């Protein structure tokens, strides 16, 4: 319907707007991953857990730069154990402060406040939320009681638009350094490979008996393969192989029917 098409388009618009702020464009003619400073904990190193207190919800925003300031002041490293879009509840560990045996409650409270929780997911740092909404629409359209491949194809069109933006960009480094180049924060950005899979796998599963859906997914992935950074090639090729197998299996089942 026109209303559903409008919803699909609006989700796509909002998702493309959000990804600009999260995923940097790769340098022109440079498909080599950029390596900055890294960090890993020394075995047995002291650390203090940061637990959610009297709250619950989806992680809507992680202020990595403000966490860098806190970590530098403590002369520590803060690892963030949750990702944008992930649910966290009271008592759950959301971060650790490494290199300290104790941390003042005021600093723990500050760290907790820099990992924002909301009543529902938001697109601010959570591009996966936009894709999740679109995939859910396609899954409902492909359910046996509805069987609306046209709407599913409209969703794939919008996912194509989003993924075409993503496959020419880089997943941000999980390591965030202070001005002196020392890693102070380690977080978990949503990986672009995972977002590609999110936008394809479930639709391919629920649309496995729809030639239109499988054909549109194949068309999309083939186009993405031609423009994507080389680092995403294996993910795209793997998905193309899965869809080819799904189509062959569906054709075989159809042939076996009396």
List each model region and its residues.
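Short basic (Lys/Arg) and small-residue
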Residues: 1-79, 83, 92-258
């Amino acid at each position: 319907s026109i209303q559903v098409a409008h919803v699909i388009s609006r989700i796509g618009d909002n998702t493309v707007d959000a990804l600009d702020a999260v995923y940097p464009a790769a340098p022109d003619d440079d498909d080599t991953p950029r390596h900055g400073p890294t960090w890993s904990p020394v075995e047995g190193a002291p650390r203090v857990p940061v637990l959610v207190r009297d709250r619950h919800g989806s992680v809507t925003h992680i202020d990595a730069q403000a966490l860098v300031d806190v970590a530098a002041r403590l002369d520590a490293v803060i690892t963030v154990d949750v990702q944008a879009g992930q649910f966290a509840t009271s008592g759950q560990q959301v971060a650790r402060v490494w290199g300290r045996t104790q941390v003042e409650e005021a600093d723990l409270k500050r760290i907790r406040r820099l990992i924002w929780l909301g009543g529902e997911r938001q697109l601010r740092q959570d591009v996966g939320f936009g894709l999740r909404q679109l995939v859910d629409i396609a899954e409902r359209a492909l359910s046996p009681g509805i069987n609306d491949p046209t709407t599913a194809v409209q969703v794939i069109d919008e996912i194509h638009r989003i993924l075409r933006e993503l496959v020419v960009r880089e997943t941000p480094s999980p390591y965030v350094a202070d001005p002196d180049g020392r890693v102070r924060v380690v977080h978990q950005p949503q990986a672009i490979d995972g977002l590609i899979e999110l936008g394809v796998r479930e639709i391919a599963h629920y649309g496995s008996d729809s030639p239109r859906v499988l054909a549109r997914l194949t068309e999309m992935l083939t186009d993405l393969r031609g423009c994507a950074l080389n680092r995403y090639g294996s993910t795209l090729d793997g998905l193309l192989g899965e869809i080819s197998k799904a189509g062959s299996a569906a054709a075989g089942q159809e042939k076996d029917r009396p």
